[in-house]
Amino acid sequence: MAPRKQREIFDATLRLVAERGYDGLTVEGVAERSGVNKTTIYRWWPSKAALLGAALVESDVLGFTVPDTGSLRGDLVALVEGVRRLLTEPPGSDIAVAALAAAVRHPELDGRRFFADRFARERAVFERAARRGELPGSADPLLIMDLLAGAVWMRAVLRGMKVGDDFATQAVALVLDGVHRPG
C-alpha cells in the first residue's frame, strides 16, 4: 500500500476513534472518511481492532522523537513532557484516551503493542545513560518509565488534574533523586 494512502487510513481511524470511541469506530466509516474502499482496508487489516492497533503504533499522530539531550535527566524530562502533551493536548489526548481505554475492554486491540513499541524506542535513552555512567546496572528502565508515564496518566487522565509545565522536571527529580533525606 502506498504510504500516503496508509497515512490517510490511519488518520481517519484515529480521528474516528477520538470522535466516536471504539464502539463507534467502523471499517466502513474509515473507508468513507479516507476515500479508500473497505475491501482494501480489510485486505491489509482483518478487523477494526487490527486496524486501530496498527494506527496507534504506526501513525505520526501519536509518534514521538526519542530525545538526546546529553543527560539522563534531560532525556527523561523530555520524554515525560512528551507524554504530558500527548495526554493533555488534542488531537493526541482524545485519541490516546479513547483508544487505550478501549483496550482495557477489548483485549483484541492489544494495547500492549503500543506500549511495547514506545518502550522499545525509549530504551535508547537508558542505553546511552548506562554508557555515560549515569545509570547503575541494577536500574530497571521499564519501571522508571512506568513510574514517570504512569504519574502523567494518573494526574491528567484518571484524576482529571492539570499537569503543569514543571511537572516533568518535578517527576523526574523524584524518581532520580528520591524523596528520602538521609539523617
Task: Go through the PLM ranges and name each one.
Residues 50-59:
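Alpha-helical DNA-contacting segments of helix-turn-helix folds
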Residues 55-56, 87-109:
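Amphipathic alpha-helical segments used for helix-helix packing
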Residues 107-132, 141-142:
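Amphipathic alpha-helical packing segments from all-alpha helical-bundle domains
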